[in-house]
């Protein structure tokens, strides 16, 4: 099997991270790969907000926990949160942003980082508190949260892939 296909199969979601900050160069490499995701008609209008500020990261975690209804850190201790947002004006942008999320996670794996997709970005950034954060960050326009890609160094062994479920592919010949 070629290396690219093998990498797709080996990437796992990491749910326990070391506190060590990821070097900016690695974060930039992951983001750059995310920006190369396909987008309908080449629009390239979904955006990424890279959060490395611990205070802001912790605030986002608190918001996310409240939506989920849990007291535990929904970012699993990861020091970096990449928020992917799609413009509400583009009906296909959510799909484009989802491709960005996939590229971010694969790129993290490629550079030796752990990652995990975290949901509830839609609810976070639909809230008044979330809208205020976007405004504070200088992000103008109407955006919908698509997901958080958390990044960091895995703390412990990365889990093996679960067996793939059967009957998920249908061929029409």
List where the protein language model places each region:
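Acidic, surface-exposed loops and disordered segments
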Residues: 1-173
